[in-house]
Amino acid sequence: MARGPLTYRRLRAILKTFGVYEEPGRGKGSERMFVGIVDGKIIRLPTKCHNEGDEKPVPVIQAIRRHFKLTKKDGVSDQEFYNRA
C-alpha cells in the first residue's frame, strides 16, 4: 500500500505491531490515547477519533510516526509501515 490516509482502525492495528497501543479509559471526549515505549521512556500521544472508520490524513500519520520514532530516519520505511497488520 502506498503512503496515504488510513482509517483509525487500520492505523491502530499498524501501531500495535510496533508496540504502540491505545490506552483504554484515557483521553477526553473524542480523544484517544496512544501509548508506547521509545528509548526506554513511556510516550503518550492523544489523537482525535470520532469513530473507528474516520480517515486520518497523511500529516497526522506523519506526526504520530515521528512521535513514536517510526520514520524512515528511525529505520522504518513507508512501505514497511503501511504493509503491517
Positions of the model-derived regions?
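Basic nucleic-acid-binding interfaces
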Residues: 1-28, 33-85
